[in-house]
């Protein structure tokens, strides 16, 4: 199977107004293949958020190589990184970040609108198909504020899939939900992973959910533990 994500010796240092650099990631190696469903765990301050920002092409590493679908992202311009991020990576966050004035359908269409600039029938069809897949066809014209927390997070999952990404980064996607809704959202992502072969990297503090992933990677003090 092809590698969707490959990290080779990723390091990250910060210089916060002093001549001394602080290194927060120390040579991270990680490989994910198409169809992987991986849990990323670690205590607060371990470097998880920094690592996720680098994987999501929101920040550049200080050293090492990051490859997405075999492409060395260190060789890309900022605009090329933005294009790659928009097409290859989907994001689901703990707080859904839906636009409250928009309907569920309009929220799912947002990544396509950013990419293409103008709504069309194909976008609406794609959004409706994704809302059907996450079980929200009946709510497609509801505003984001007129849905439950679990429904809002399902819309966020559909939005993450709008550009048919190879990799979805889910940062504590169930952390703001009750137990049943959290399980439902997790199972939805798991089903999509199995049906579409979409690779998922799930950041979670929930041991039960992590145990149901294919693999658990723990980050401690800026390194992969074990």
UniProtKB/Swiss-Prot annotation:
Membrane topology, from the record: Peripheral membrane protein
ABC transporter domain residues: 5-225
- Reading the lineage from the top rank, the first entry is Bacteria
**Which Pfam families does the entry link to?**
ABC_tran
What is one cellular component GO term in this UniProt entry?
A: plasma membrane
Binding of ATP: at which residues?
A: 42-49
Q: Does the keyword ATP-binding apply?
A: yes
Any one of the GO BP annotations: lipoprotein localization to outer membrane
Where is it located? Cell inner membrane
Which CDD domains does the entry mention? ABC_MJ0796_LolCDE_FtsE
Q: What is its EC number?
A: 7.6.2.-
Which keywords does this chain's UniProt record carry? Answer: ATP-binding, Cell inner membrane, Cell membrane, Membrane, Nucleotide-binding, Translocase, Transport
Q: Name one GO molecular function term.
A: transmembrane transporter activity
**Record note on quaternary structure:** The complex is composed of two ATP-binding proteins (LolD) and two transmembrane proteins (LolC and LolE).
Q: What does this protein do?
A: Part of the ABC transporter complex LolCDE involved in the translocation of mature outer membrane-directed lipoproteins, from the inner membrane to the periplasmic chaperone, LolA. Responsible for the formation of the LolA-lipoprotein complex in an ATP-dependent manner.
Please give the family membership noted in the entry: Belongs to the ABC transporter superfamily. Lipoprotein translocase (TC 3.A.1.125) family.
Name of this chain's protein = Lipoprotein-releasing system ATP-binding protein LolD 1
Name of the encoding gene: lolD1
């Amino acid at each position: 199977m092809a590698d969707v994500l490959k990290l080779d010796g990723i390091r990250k240092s910060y210089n916060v107004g002093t001549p001394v650099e602080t290194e927060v990631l120390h040579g991270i190696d990680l490989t994910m293949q198409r169809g992987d469903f991986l849990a990323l765990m670690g205590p607060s301050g371990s470097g998880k958020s920094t690592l996720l920002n680098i994987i999501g092409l929101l920040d550049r590493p200080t050293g090492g190589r990051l490859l997405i679908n075999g492409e060395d992202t260190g060789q890309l311009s900022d605009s090329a990184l933005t294009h790659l991020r928009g097409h290859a990576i989907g994001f689901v966050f703990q707080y859904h970040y839906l636009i409250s004035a928009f309907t569920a359908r309009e929220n799912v269409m947002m990544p396509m609108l950013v990419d293409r600039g103008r709504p069309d029938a194909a976008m609406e069809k794609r959004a409706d198909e994704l809302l059907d897949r996450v079980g929200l066809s009946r709510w497609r014209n509801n505003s984001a504020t007129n849905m439950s927390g679990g429904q809002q997070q399902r819309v966020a999952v559909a939005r993450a899939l709008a550009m048919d990404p190879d990799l979805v980064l889910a940062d504590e996607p169930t952390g703001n939900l009750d137990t049943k809704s959290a399980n439902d959202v997790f199972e939805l992502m798991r089903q999509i992973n199995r049906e579409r072969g979409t690779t998922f990297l799930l950041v979670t503090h929930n041991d039960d959910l992590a145990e149901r992933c294919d693999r658990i990677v723990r980050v401690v003090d800026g390194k992969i533990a074990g």
